[in-house]
Amino acid sequence: MNHPETKEKKWRIFGALPANIVSLGWVSLFTDMSSEMIYPLLPLILTSVVGAGTTFVGLVEGIAEATASLLKLFSGWFSDRLGKRKTLVVAGYTLSAMARPLRAATTAGWHLLLVGFLDRVGKGIRTSPRDALLSDSVRREETGKAFGFQRAMGHAGAVAGPLIAFFLLTFLTAD
């Protein structure tokens, strides 16, 4: 997958990073922003709104994260075999993006468990192929810059998400 001779010719944004890297950075920013808007509130929603116990909160998070971790192993191998990393990356991000709004419609703990599971399936499908795509999109000496940009955008989203949630809850709620 790594073709150094073609990497020189790929379209680059601002002459610094290939479009794949910049696009994945922006997607990471918005994905992490949306995740971190709800993530700090999820235990509160589970215990006070849905009425779940603290053990169930741990179960929800444990199942979700275990699912993502196990799928990363499979999706990395599968993207190597398939040779179409972008397809898996798009599928994973799409599944997560479709699952997240469903949290608003949940009325029971098992609903949140299922939606969290679907969200993390998306993460598990996309993460390894995304990282391989990042690596494939740049010359070897640029991999640090590519991963650094993508991670920085993701972390910026992780910081902005809770701040936006705080603003929305503070200024746009009646209580």
Residue ranges: model-predicted function:
Residues 115-156:
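Cytoplasmic helix-loop-helix junction between adjacent transmembrane helices
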Residues 44-49, 160-175:
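Transmembrane alpha-helix termini and helix-breaking/packing motifs in multi-pass membrane transporters
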Residues 102-115:
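Helix-loop junctions at membrane interfaces in 12-TM secondary transporters
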Residues 87-101:
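Structural signature of the two symmetry-related core transmembrane helices
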Residues 65-73, 158-159:
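Residue-level signature of mid-helix packing/kink "hotspots" within the transmembrane helices
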Residues 9-68:
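Helix-loop boundary and gating motifs at the non-cytosolic
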Residues 71-83, 169:
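Helix-to-loop junctions at the C-terminal end of transmembrane segments
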